Amino acid sequence: MNKEVAIELRRITKTFGNVVANKDVDLTVYKGEILAILGENGSGKTTLMNMIAGIYYPDEGHIIVGGEEAVIKSPKDAFRYKIGMIHQHFKLVDVFTASENVILGVNDGSKYRLSDVNERVAAIAEKYGFIINPKKKIHEMSVSEKQTVEIIKVLYRGADILILDEPTAVLTPQETEKLFAVLRKMKEDGKSIIIITHKMHEVLSISDRVAVLRKGEHIATVNTAETSEAELTEMMVGKKISLNINRPEPKNPCERLVVSNISSVDSEGVQVLDDISFTAFSGEILGIAGIAGSGQRELLESIAGLYPITSGEIMYNNPASGEMENLRNKTPMQIRDLGVRLSFVPEDRLGMGLVGNMGITDNIMLRSYTRGKSVFLDRIPPKNLAKEIIKSLEVSTPDEETPVRRLSGGNVQKVLVGREIASAPSVLMAAYPVRGLDINSSYMIYNLLTQQKENGVAVIFVGEDLDVLTELCDRILVINGGKITGILDGRTAKKEEIGLLMTKHVSSAEAKEGESNAEK
């Protein structure tokens, strides 16, 4: 029996100035299936889906819904064709309840009783297996609960075609499994589910078919059961690449950074770090896992001298002098003047890491460089070093003088990582260093971090992919609500165990006990 087509794209093209986001894309989505849209950053996945959802309008091509051509120029038009999109960044009003957010923007001329809306929201939740309190305010919800509200919003409006953009990016493994269970129930109900993602293992777990995009073009659509991770990766990148992460045992580790009982509050007096203690050793990679906004950014910035702490100590064991230096509330300049060789790849690339209007060479000149072990040449002029970074990390740029703000996010990240590694650090902190990078470049960065570890550098790596954390890191520190909930051995840690700690609240005594056990 032939499958019934829910939506079909024919020769869809979309450009932004001289940039071709999508070119002659053909795609078919069937009723009652889960289709994964797979591609690297910049491959055109989100742009293509935004045209189905009415955010953009195609320059060329046709969208066919239910056998008829559809003109979709706004999200309101999309809902008329029973299409709804759940974006990666939620569009909710924090002070409203779940139900109030659900009916916000429903302009059909009807009057709504909130009690009736609450009942219908509860009925939708029960039908598909959601757990949600319709009367709960958004600011009181977890990330997964907020995502549930977004999904119910489109179901309430009658959506039969649902598009989810990176739906698991901020979820724990347990929350991801719950979401997948809900999506499978929707599929059984005849809904068409389109998932935009770059996580290969999730694609193989949840989808029926996979459509691969590369550089704005549709490469192929394959049955998930008939493909493999290696085949999909080759289609995404255009060549065969190795997806192996090398994790050698730490050699002669010694205490390099000792963080003791540090706490901090933000500008509004809200505690963002609560009695944090851990030790980073030379020759190891210490991973930091946590739901977004759990204190990862503040922790690294406090060590780098960019965020004040209210209590505690940050001690650096200087390998040159053998003396312990206290870095508490010192500025980056003061830290450097102490002879501390600390490199930092911040989460905010252009706001904190690089100067957007300056070229790569000038951004490199912002730092002083000393001879050290790295993949880059030592003691060479900044311009030559810029060329070496461009070559080694395959930075796509017209030349080394091009302002970095004109580069893509992934290329900006490569410049920043290259500059920080070239400074020959003894401590290297990297917050989401592969965010925005393609698969090939991501594994290049993982290998660079491993090389730094083998050179005796204490590497602190903040990541969001638990598979990478468990493959790359020697130990994994888990943080939630500004408090350490556990420190695990990276070689034995399970993703599910990390996920539980990411949502668990523990006492300071429990966290210290976990740290002690991890270091034994």
Question: Model-derived features: where do they sit?
Answer:
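Glycine-rich phosphate-binding loops of nucleotide-dependent enzymes
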Residues: 2-520
